[in-house]
Curated annotation (Swiss-Prot):
InterPro entries: P_C10 (IPR026317). It comes from Bos taurus (Bovine). In brain, may be required for corpus callosum development. It holds the Pfam family P_C10. It comes from the Eukaryota. This is Protein C10. It is found in: Cytoplasm. GO terms for cellular component: cytoplasm.
Length: 132
């Protein structure tokens, strides 16, 4: 038997878009922007410190929004929301885009290893194209 909170947290794809947009908007609220900036400064672009400082703040910001939609106001609620969004990403490009924007707000940019002619990793070479 499903709990009442699990039933009320079931969102349609359209509802998920609305909630995602609200969560993204919450990150731009002045007080939340300050909290995130402070957390990022404390993390110094170190992935371990990002998990320690940035992720908890990002989780709290999300919790403040999603609790109005039936998700529990704890880490489990955020995980359930994330799983729900993930389940819609493949079917709905707008949800995938919003989800990517949300992740970009609290995950550090990933740097790719260099791919130059010296490493044999150029895009043209990988496609079998010869450049003049």
């Amino acid at each position: 038997m499903a709990s009442a909170s699990a039933q009320s947290a079931a969102l349609s794809a359209e509802q998920a878009k609305v909630v995602l947009a609200e969560v993204i908007q919450a990150f731009s609220a002045p007080e939340n922007a300050v909290r995130m900036d402070e957390a990022r400064d404390n993390a110094c672009n170190d992935m371990g410190k990002m998990l320690q400082f940035v992720l908890p703040v990002a989780t709290q910001i999300q919790q403040e929004v999603i609790k109005a939609y039936g998700f529990s106001c704890d880490g489990e609620g955020v995980l359930k929301f994330a799983r729900l969004v993930k389940s819609y990403e493949a079917q709905d490009p707008e949800i995938a885009s919003l989800s990517g924007k949300l992740k970009a707000l609290f995950l550090p940019p990933m740097t790719l290893p260099p791919h130059g002619p010296a490493s044999g990793g150029s895009v043209a070479a990988s496609l079998g194209l010869a450049l003049p």
